[in-house]
Curated annotation (Swiss-Prot):
This is tRNA modification GTPase MnmE. It comes from Klebsiella pneumoniae (strain 342). Its main location: cytoplasm. It is found in: Cytoplasm. HAMAP family: GTPase_MnmE. GO terms for molecular function: GTP binding; GTPase activity; metal ion binding. Homodimer. Heterotetramer of two MnmE and two MnmG subunits.
Length: 454
């Protein structure tokens, strides 16, 4: 599809509503205004007009807004028609507009894509539009808005600019080797490089916070039947999300709850009790439990404190520990402290965190909440942050690795050419975040996840 086409889409959610908005962008937007409204509205002024069919009879009436390019969201001529939000009315108006030559339905995210291609937004800002719409908490929404307003892009652009200056300095040292001053060994380049690396580390720390805000943490509650897994899910969720009985094997499928701990999204997953099951339904539930465990960020290993005094997970259930993916963090949760009389709280045992609590009474659950937040490095005190995606983290990590390699070349062999190449690669990795160096395939994947009218 051509970017020269004029596109139209509904900008409001599908279904009935008080207001429904159609957005038109492109060279033919002016023709749409003349055909549907009978005139071109005054730029950036609300005009109350009938929306006319092909034969001139009104289909609806409402507000028309005209934004001539380049002073519009997409950078093109944009017309917005704000009418009544009935699906039939909007469908009739959409069909009327599509009768005009050169106008087609927009692809998902095509309005934002055009804004990016016309330099109205960089790629990180365009992604922030979708993140703002999908925000699941107030803190995530504020951070997404910061990204949309350019906070993340400004940090990245500052790093790119610093790398540009450093590359100029390094390449000057390479091009003028006969100068009396040895630029590579006089310490100035190393000092500048260390400064850029420190700034990059700070951005990476904020980006990790932003990624947590956007994607959350996946925590799976696992253990033997009747250990109190469903009771813990209910305690963390603050509601009766799971059925709790004294019958072993009550939970036979995966249960999911989405909560927030001081703004950090948490995906809690309750699983079927793990055992050798003869029942086919329970067996399938146990297999699903293992699938969830393998994809978790952390596992809460639930232990019935009345059945064992052991605290080392390898001693409590060695077969379970052996099957866990390598490097998957585990928190041992000894439940039923209200019955055993154990002291509530958090401790460390053989490299694993151990929490004693009572899921039934809720005692010690707040300790677990704080532990989950701290284990992911989530900092609630960070203000003015931004959201980040996995591709952003990967790009920042790649840039950091190139700078480390460059520093090794500088200090190990004074290899200016190799240092310059590592700086170039780091700069390229950072530029992928804002879209300065990004493949068309990646752009297609990013914008295809947007709403149709965005």
């Amino acid at each position: 599809m051509s970017h020269n086409d004029t596109i139209v889409a509904q900008a409001t959610p599908p279904g009935r509503g008080g207001v429904g908005i159609l957005r038109i962008s492109g060279l033919k937007a002016r023709d749409v205004a003349q055909a549907v409204l009978g005139k071109l509205p005054k730029p950036r002024y609300a005009d109350y007009l009938p929306f006319n069919d092909v034969d001139g009879t009104p289909l609806d009436q409402g507000i028309a807004l005209w934004f001539p390019g380049p002073n519009s969201f997409t950078g093109e001529d944009v017309l917005e028609l704000q009418g009544h939000g009935g699906p039939v009315i909007l469908d009739l108006l959409l069909k009327r507009i599509l009768t005009l030559p050169g106008v087609r339905i927009a692809r998902p995210g095509e309005f934002s894509e055009r804004a990016f291609l016309n330099d109205k937004l960089d790629l990180a800002q365009a992604e922030a539009i979708a993140d703002l719409i999908d925000a699941s908490s107030e803190q995530a929404a504020r951070s997404a808005l910061n990204s949309l307003q350019g906070a993340f892009s400004a940090r990245v652009n500052h790093l790119v600019e610093a790398l540009t200056h450093l590359r100029i300095y390094v390449e000057a040292a390479i091009d003028f080797p006969d100068e009396e001053i040895d630029f590579l060994s006089d310490g100035k380049i190393e000092a500048q490089l260390n400064g850029v690396m420190a700034d990059l580390d700070a951005v990476r720390a904020e980006a990790r916070q932003g990624s947590l805000l956007r994607e959350g943490m996946k925590v799976v509650i696992a253990g033997r039947p009747n250990a109190g897994k469903s009771s813990l899910l209910n305690a963390l969720a603050g509601r009766e999300a799971a059925i709790v009985t004294d019958i072993a094997g009550t939970t036979r499928d995966v249960l999911r709850e989405h909560i927030h701990i001081d703004g950090m999204p948490l995906h809690i997953i309750d699983t079927a009790g793990l055992r050798d099951a003869s029942d086919e339904v329970e067996r399938i539930g146990i297999e699903r439990a293992w699938q969830e465990i393998e994809q978790a960020d952390r596992v809460l290993f639930m232990v019935d404190g009345t059945t064992t005094s052991a605290v080392d997970p390898a001693e409590i259930w060695p077969d379970f520990i052996e099957r866990l993916p390598a490097k998957l963090p585990i928190t041992v949760v000894r439940n039923k402290a209200d019955v055993t009389g154990e002291a509530l709280g958090l401790s460390e045992v053989n490299g694993h965190s151990l929490i004693r609590l009572s899921a039934r009474t809720g005692e010690g659950v707040e300790v677990l909440r704080n532990h989950l937040k701290q284990s992911m490095g989530f900092d609630t005190s960070m203000e003015g942050g931004f959201l980040a995606r996995r591709r952003h983290l990967q790009a920042l990590e790649e840039a950091a690795n190139h700078l480390q390699q460059g520093k090794a070349q500088l200090l190990g062999a004074w290899a200016g050419e190799l240092l310059a190449e590592e700086l170039r690669l780091a700069q390229q990795a950072l530029s992928e975040i804002t879209g300065e160096f990004t493949s068309d395939d990646l752009l297609g994947r990013i914008f295809s996840s947007f709403c149709i009218g965005k």
